[in-house]
C-alpha cells in the first residue's frame, strides 16, 4: 500500500496534467458559451500554476493554444499580449540590474552601509534590512537575498567567536562572503573547494553548540534579510513582477486610463508604504527574537566587545578587498541615476515632464513610456566600455591590442535573465484579454453586484488577506495574474475605483512571510539551516496582518489623492457600468 502511494506521489505531476483537463470538461460541454470556454482555460491554468504540475512559464503559454481553438481571440492578437510595454519595462530594468550585479556594485553598496551602521544588534539588523530593501527595489529579490545571507552569516560567525579575528588580521579572504545561491531543494552549503555539505547535519550540530542567544540573533538576521527583500520590492514598479502585472492589466483592461500607473505614481504611493512596513518588521523581529531592551540592543553606553570588533573587521576587510571603484562601477552608477531621474520626470502628472514636452502625441501625452527609457539605458550599457578606452594589450596574444568589453555582454544577459517571468507576464495579459473578449469579465461583474452594500475599506482588507494567504503557497506572479482581472470586473460592477482593490491586492502578493516555499528569498535563508518552519510561521503570521493593515492605511490616506480613488473614473466605464457616474461611485470609499 505504501508503495502505491509513493508511486502516485512520484507521478503526481503527470497525473494532474492528464486528469485535471478531463475533470474540467463538463464545464464547456454543458455550458457551450465563450464565457464557459474562457473559464475552463482560466481554471485549468490556475490549477496548474498552484500545483506547479508544469513549469509556470509553460502553463503561461496555454492561451496561445486554447483561446484561438475555442474561438475566443485570434492567435495573432493573443501573441501580441506576450510582448507588451510592461514586459519591455521589466526586461530593460533587469538589464540594469544584471549590470549592477555583474560588476559587484551591489556588494560594495551593502558593505559600505554596514560599515556605517556598525555591528551592535539593533543597528546591525536595521542596516541589513535597509540595504536589502534598497537593493531589492532595483535588482531581483532572489539575487539580493543570495548575496546578503552569506554576508550576514559571516558577521554572525565573527560575533560568536572572536578566534576568527586572527584570520582577518592575516588578511585572509573569508569564504563565507563568496556570492552563492544555495538550492532550496537540495539544501546544501557550497564551499570554496567545490564540495557540498548537507545543511541538515550542520544545522543539528550548530544548534547543539550555539548559545540560545546567538541562535535567536541568527534567526532574526536570516528573517530580516528575506523579509526586507520582499518588502523592498514593493517600492518601485520594477521591484517585483506583480507590480508590472498590475500596470499591464490596467493598460489592457482600461486602455483609456491615461497612464495612471507609471513609475512616478507607483513610487509616490508604494515607497512610504514600504518604509513603514520595513520599520515595523524591524521592531517586530527585535521584540520576538531579542526582546525589547532598547539600551542593550543598541549598545548604548557600552564599549564594543572583542567579538563585535572582529565582526566589524570582517566587513572592513571585505570592503577593502573590493579595491577602489572601477570605471565600470562608476559608469553603471551614473547610468543608474540617469535612469531613475528619467523615470521620475518623464510624465510625473503634477507638472509637464520631458516626455510631454519633447515627444507629445495629439492629446499632449508622452509617446515615450517607462519601458522606452529602460531599454534605452540598457542598450547604452552594451555600448559603453567596461574600462577607460586606451591602448589595452591582449593578455592572450601579446603585442596585439584588444578593446575592452562593454558594461554588458549578451552572454551574461542570457545567463542571468529570467526569461520565464517574461512569458509568465505575457500569459497573464493574454488571460485578461480572453476574459474581456469572451464576456467572462462582464458576467463576473454582474454576479458580484451584491457587494456594493459592503463598505469599500472592508472589501479591500478582506481581499488583501485572501491574496496574502493565497500567495503563501502559490507564485506571487500567478496569484496576481489570477486575481486582478476578477477584481477589476468586481470593481466595475459595484461602481468602485478599480485601483482601490487592485492596488492593495497587488501589494499583498509581496506579503509572503510565513512559509519557506512562499518565495525564493524565504527558501534561500531556510536552506542555511538555522530556521525551522515554525520559526518562520511564528514571525510571519503577525507580519502578514501588519502588512495588510499598513496597505489599508496607505490606500485610504495618501493613495486617495494620488489616484483619485474617491470617485469612479470615466476610463473604467463600460456598457454595464453606464450608471456609475462619479457622483454615484461607492459612497463608502473615504473622501480625501
From Swiss-Prot:
Could you give one GO CC term from the UniProt record?
apical plasma membrane
Question: What name appears for this protein in its UniProt entry?
Answer: Solute carrier family 13 member 2
What membrane topology does the UniProt entry give? Multi-pass membrane protein
Q: Which residues cross the membrane?
A: 13-33, 53-73, 86-106, 114-134, 221-241, 274-294, 324-344, 371-391, 450-470, 482-502, 511-531, 545-565
Would I find DNA damage among this entry's keywords?
no
The record's CDD domains line, in alphabetical order, gives: SLC13_permease (cd01115)
Annotated Pfam families: Na_sulph_symp (PF00939)
Tell me which UniProt keywords the record has, alphabetically.
Cell membrane, Ion transport, Membrane, Sodium, Sodium transport, Symport, Transmembrane, Transmembrane helix, Transport
Q: Which gene encodes it?
A: SLC13A2
Tell me the lineage of the source organism: Eukaryota, Metazoa, Chordata, Craniata, Vertebrata
Amino acid at each position: 500500500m505504501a508503495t502505491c502511494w509513493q508511486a502516485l506521489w512520484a507521478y503526481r505531476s503527470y497525473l494532474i496534467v492528464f486528469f485535471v483537463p478531463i475533470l474540467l470538461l463538463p464545464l464547456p460541454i454543458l455550458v457551450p458559451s465563450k464565457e464557459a470556454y474562457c473559464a475552463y482555460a482560466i481554471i485549468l491554468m490556475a490549477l496548474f500554476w498552484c500545483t506547479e504540475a508544469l513549469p509556470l512559464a509553460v502553463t503561461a503559454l496555454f492561451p496561445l493554444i486554447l483561446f484561438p481553438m475555442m474561438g475566443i481571440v485570434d492567435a495573432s492578437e493573443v501573441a501580441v499580449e506576450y510582448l507588451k510595454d510592461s514586459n519591455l519595462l521589466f526586461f530593460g530594468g533587469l538589464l540594469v540590474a544584471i549590470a549592477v550585479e555583474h560588476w559587484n556594485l551591489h556588494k560594495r553598496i551593502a558593505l559600505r552601509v554596514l560599515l556605517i551602521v556598525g555591528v551592535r544588534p539593533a543597528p546591525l539588523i536595521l542596516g541589513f534590512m535597509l540595504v536589502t530593501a534598497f537593493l531589492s527595489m532595483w535588482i531581483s529579490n532572489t539575487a539580493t537575498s543570495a548575496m546578503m545571507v552569506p554576508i550576514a552569516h559571516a558577521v554572525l560567525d565573527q560575533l560568536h567567536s572572536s578566534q576568527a579575528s586572527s584570520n582577518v588580521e592575516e588578511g585572509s579572504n573569508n569564504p563565507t562572503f563568496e556570492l552563492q545561491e544555495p538550492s532550496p531543494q537540495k539544501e546544501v552549503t557550497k564551499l570554496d573547494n567545490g564540495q557540498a555539505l548537507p545543511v541538515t547535519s550542520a544545522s543539528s550540530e550548530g544548534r547543539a553548540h550555539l548559545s540560545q542567544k546567538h541562535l535567536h540573533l541568527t534567526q532574526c538576521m536570516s528573517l530580516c534579510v528575506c523579509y526586507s527583500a520582499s518588502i523592498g520590492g514593493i517600492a518601485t514598479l520594477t521591484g517585483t513582477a506583480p507590480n508590472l502585472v498590475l500596470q499591464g492589466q490596467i493598460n489592457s483592461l482600461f486602455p483609456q486610463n491615461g497612464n495612471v500607473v507609471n513609475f512616478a505614481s507607483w513610487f509616490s504611493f508604494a515607497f512610504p508604504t514600504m518604509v513603514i512596513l520595513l520599520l515595523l518588521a524591524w521592531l517586530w523581529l527585535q521584540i520576538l527574537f531579542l526582546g525589547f531592551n532598547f539600551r542593550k540592543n543598541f549598545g548604548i553606553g557600552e564599549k564594543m566587545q572583542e567579538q563585535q570588533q572582529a565582526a566589524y573587521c570582517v566587513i572592513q576587510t571585505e570592503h577593502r578587498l573590493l579595491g577602489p571603484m572601477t570605471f565600470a562601477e562608476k559608469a553603471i552608477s551614473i547610468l543608474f541615476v540617469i535612469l531613475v531621474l528619467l523615470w521620475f520626470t518623464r510624465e510625473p502628472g503634477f507638472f509637464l515632464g520631458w516626455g510631454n514636452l519633447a515627444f507629445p502625441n495629439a492629446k499632449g501625452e508622452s509617446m515615450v513610456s517607462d519601458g522606452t527609457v529602460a531599454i534605452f539605458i540598457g542598450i547604452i550599457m552594451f555600448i559603453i566600455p567596461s574600462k577607460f578606452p586606451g591602448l589595452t594589450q591582449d593578455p592572450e596574444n601579446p603585442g596585439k591590442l584588444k578593446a575592452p568589453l562593454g558594461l554588458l555582454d549578451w552572454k551574461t544577459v542570457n545567463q542571468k535573465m529570467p526569461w520565464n517571468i517574461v512569458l509568465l507576464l505575457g500569459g497573464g495579459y493574454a488571460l485578461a484579454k480572453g476574459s474581456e473578449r469572451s464576456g467572462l469579465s462582464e458576467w463576473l461583474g454582474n454576479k458580484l453586484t451584491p457587494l456594493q452594500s459592503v463598505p469599500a475599506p472592508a472589501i479591500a482588507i478582506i481581499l488583501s488577506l485572501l491574496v496574502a494567504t493565497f500567495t503563501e503557497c502559490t507564485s506571487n506572479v500567478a496569484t496576481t495574474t489570477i486575481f486582478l482581472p476578477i477584481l477589476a470586473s468586481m470593481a466595475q460592477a459595484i461602481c468602485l475605483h478599480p485601483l482601490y482593490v487592485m492596488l492593495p491586492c497587488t501589494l499583498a502578493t509581496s506579503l509572503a512571510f510565513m512559509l519557506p516555499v512562499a518565495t525564493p528569498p524565504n527558501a534561500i535563508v531556510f536552506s542555511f539551516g538555522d530556521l525551522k518552519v515554525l520559526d518562520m510561521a511564528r514571525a510571519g503570521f503577525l507580519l502578514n496582518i501588519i502588512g495588510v493593515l499598513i496597505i489599508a492605511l496607505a490606500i485610504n490616506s495618501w493613495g486617495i489623492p494620488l489616484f483619485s480613488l474617491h470617485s469612479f473614473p470615466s476610463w473604467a466605464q463600460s456598457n454595464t457600468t453606464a450608471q456609475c457616474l462619479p457622483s454615484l461611485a461607492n459612497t463608502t470609499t473615504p473622501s480625501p
